Amino acid sequence: ITVGVKDTGVKSGIIGEIGNFWPTNETSRKILRASAHASVETGAAISIHPGGHPDALLQHLNDLIEAGADPARIIMGHLDVFPYSPEVVKEIAETGATLEFDRFGSENTNFAEGGHDIAFPSDVQRIERIEQLIEWGYESQIVVAQDVCLKTDLVSHGGGGYIHILDSIIPRMRKRGFSTENIDNILIENPKRILTFT
């Protein structure tokens, strides 16, 4: 973050994605504490991959906050992957953390976590959750992404690819009544805020 990658001049702009599991263990908690210390020292935001249980979200946040991290510098990712209730996501929002919905385009995907099959929500369900959060007053904390991380996420292999949000999701949001301001905040202003070092 401060030195860069060898002599390239390229520096990391974010701490993470910090992977976590549930139940958490002392090694994971130590990594979270180190991430918090690095964020305080550098001003970089922290991106969290939470464990797949509702209790994991607040546990990870509490570990970071207790170690000194500013909740406004924490991005809680994959809020649209695991079956978190609206109430749990609202609890995260109330801390001031950024809410990341990052698996747009993965509607027909499922995987196993902790011995349970998890079916991802549809893009419509993701949009509905974001709409609900905006109604609750959390628009300034929402970011979206596609987390293109599997071959099947690529257009050449049947996925939505890197353009899915702009080509498919934004038009759907507009049809549902999202304003230009809503969309600009989610796509531009909120990422700009969280990615700017403090």
Residue spans of the language-model regions?
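Active-site glycine- and acidic-residue-rich loops that bind
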Residues: I74-P86, E107-E131
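Distinct, well-ordered alpha-helical segments
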Residues: E26-R29, H53-G68, S85-A93
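Short helix-capping segments at alpha-helix termini
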Residues: E66-A72, W136-Y138, K175-S179
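Short acidic/histidine-rich active-site segments
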Residues: S47, F101-R103, Y138-G159, I183
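Active-site gating/metal-coordination segments in enzymes
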Residues: I1-E41, T95-T98, G105, G115-H116
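Structural preference for beta-strand elements that scaffold enzyme active sites
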Residues: S12-I14, A45-S47, R73-I75, G96-E100, ...
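Active-site beta-loop-alpha junctions enriched in small/polar residues
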Residues: N20, G51-H53, G77-F82, F104-S106, ...
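Mid-to-C-terminal alpha-helical segments outside catalytic/metal-binding sites
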Residues: H164-T198
